[in-house]
């Protein structure tokens, strides 16, 4: 009897390619230097948000301000399925604090200043999104730990059914010992295990200050976004910016930057 291993082989190839891509990005990052920081801008004076999209609100008893990866899974599981990433963003309590960066040196790269990588602060967790391109289907996490380390995780959208607690971690493994995050985030160590899936912490990194994109610029991109041409990108920007106050926030200055 001939056994066909092609599906497993292709899955392994994709995992290896993903890890090598992250590793290659880190090599580029090592050549970069720190730039200046722009002044923070706030959209706190924006008009009142419109009525919420049906279903894109946390039901009673479920927090719409998740502070941990586990609490985020609980919110996702409480929202209607299939759940889009824009709907999840809309469901989050306002005000939101964000930091946007146009750097392409990431496994979730920005598509220029018009579609930057956007970090959302839900202390002690930092989530990240990008409105278009590679990584636009991902919600990435860094749940902060002492000494500028963080627990890494990611969730792929749309979410079709309730997630297991281990779901944010089970796609990150490169092999039995390290994750795909370990190529860029040094000092990776196992912190715990859940449902047989290992969870790893590693060095937390912040974007280069000079790559910052202001909230004012993001608001402008939402205002001019053509929904007939870029429906998903417009939906992502609207999910983030269209439902209440969004303000800028800095990362801790003691945290290392991408590229040193």
Predicted regions and their residues:
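N-terminal secretory signal peptides that target proteins for export/translocation
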Residues: 1-20
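Short stretches within intrinsically disordered, low-complexity N-terminal or propeptide regions
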Residues: 4, 26-29, 46-50
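Short, intrinsically disordered, low-complexity terminal segments
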Residues: 21-24, 41-45, 55-57, 75
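Bacterial N-terminal signal peptides
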Residues: 22-34
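Ser/Thr-rich, Pro/Gly/Ala-heavy low-complexity intrinsically disordered linkers and tails
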Residues: 35-51
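Extracytoplasmic c-type cytochrome modules immediately beyond a signal peptide or single-pass transmembrane anchor
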Residues: 49-176, 199-260
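The canonical Cys-X-X-Cys-His
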Residues: 178-189
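Short Cys/His-rich "knuckle" micro-motifs
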Residues: 191-196
